Amino acid sequence: MANNKSAQKRIQVNERNRLQNRFYKSSVRTLIKVFLKNLEIYKTSKSPEGKEKLQKILSSVYSLIDKGTKKNVFHKNAAARKKAKLASSLKIS
């Protein structure tokens, strides 16, 4: 356990930030899985509603990745890499 106030505060701040980072990373992973699952469904049906749904999911993934980057959860290059991978997977289909 920490002996002085500043060390105790750092422990509290680090724990708070760890939980926030975990939330962002988990949410991004979950949304990416949802996007990829819907992408597979779209590849089989090719419906315009499916394409619209994919665009909506993709924009929400982008938004969450950008918010995480702004809060230093993701490095900017890692965020760009994730977004490019998703965009290329949509473009291929």
Swiss-Prot record:
Q: Known SUPFAM superfamilies for this protein?
A: Ribosomal protein S20
Q: Which residues cross the membrane?
A: none
Key word Chloroplast present = yes
Which BP terms from GO are recorded? Answer: translation
What are the record keywords, sorted?
Chloroplast, Plastid, Ribonucleoprotein, Ribosomal protein, RNA-binding, rRNA-binding
Q: Where in the cell is it found?
A: Plastid, Chloroplast
Database matches in Pfam families: Ribosomal_S20p
GO MF terms listed in the record are: small ribosomal subunit rRNA binding; structural constituent of ribosome
Q: Which domain of life is it from?
A: Eukaryota
The question of whether Transcription is a record keyword is answered with no
Query: Per the record, what is one GO cellular component?
Result: small ribosomal subunit
Family to which this protein belongs: Belongs to the bacterial ribosomal protein bS20 family.
Q: What job does this protein perform? A: Binds directly to 16S ribosomal RNA.
Q: What name has this protein been given in UniProt?
A: Small ribosomal subunit protein bS20c
